[in-house]
Amino acid sequence: MFIGVGTDIVQIPRIEKILHLYPELFAKKILTSKELAQFSLLDKTGHAVFLAKRFAAKEAVSKAFGVGIGQGINLKDITILNDNLGKPIVEVSSNYTKKLPPFNIHLSLSDDYPVCVAFAVIESSCNVISR
């Protein structure tokens, strides 16, 4: 069963400006510990794109759930990782998912400076969704 679809676009220069003002604070505010571990391995030149893609992805996933960030789900409730081939994998905090039936999240990320885009589709095998 289809639950929802969400998309988000982020201007990479906007993230670059934020990083210039708050180099460590912004990453710690939006990334989970697993994402911060990946982030710390990157060269600084890749920081803005990494953060822009993660922010867009989290917004897209929250929109697909039909709630939006801060409206029942927070940035740190969503973790975006990659499998061995680079495919995005989404993990959602059990604090949020305990109210939901089993679901799958499909996520696509792309960037072409100065923008990045995220597209998320959420599906469930159950017929009823309670929030």
Swiss-Prot record:
The keyword Lipid biosynthesis applies. Signal peptide: none annotated. It is an enzyme of class 2 (transferase). Its EC number is 2.7.8.7. One of its GO terms (molecular function) is magnesium ion binding. Keywords: Cytoplasm, Fatty acid biosynthesis, Fatty acid metabolism, Lipid biosynthesis, Lipid metabolism, Magnesium, Metal-binding, Transferase. One of its GO terms (cellular component) is cytoplasm. It catalyses: apo-[ACP] + CoA = holo-[ACP] + adenosine 3',5'-bisphosphate + H(+). Its main location: cytoplasm. Belongs to the P-Pant transferase superfamily. AcpS family. HAMAP family: AcpS. This is Holo-[acyl-carrier-protein] synthase.
